[in-house]
């Protein structure tokens, strides 16, 4: 049976942990708000770029651009976006398990991974797949450079025929309590569907071929960028939820320990009183 001192020390320890988890929850909430603002700010550009690419790509076929080439085998590249830090529940684990299960069902045993985020890299290292490039702890100012490098690397391998398809894997941020593991095909590029029909004839200068060639890489880079924004928002939402649950659990544990302490102290006092009374009666 633990002593009263041991119980007091345990209560103090849990209270310190509760303060830490509560602070982490507030920090994650603030970061989540900033991530949501950044995601909303990127939406107009993404929508307009999607509209232009949709209009242009409808004019061309597979033979007009190698990025439209249909796969002839199952050689697969994967861009995996995860967080660098943990303490966010099953946020990263669920995503990694989803992509590995999907690859297994597709008969892919040795995909080429580019991992962005330490958690995904650590997970894939334990699998049969190959990591050809890893980016971890990327500061905000370096994200555009990393995106350009990742897209350029995978595009080069796809055009050279080393890969037949390239997948983008991330957790789509739906709401605070919902992050949906998502697998999208980056290459071959699947032209986005037009959101609305515009019957007006559009004049392009220079030629539509040149404009489409310049925009396709920008379009893919933007897909990766918006997915990264989703990952950031989802990470902070998952961590905020996890820390809220941890703070609540710590509070419940403190209440139980305090009750146990009070009962133990009362029992100790009662025992001492009985001993005193018994001693006085013997005199």
Residue ranges of predicted features:
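C-terminal beta-strand-loop-alpha-helix "lid" module of Rossmann-like NAD(P)-dependent dehydrogenases
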Residues: 1-283
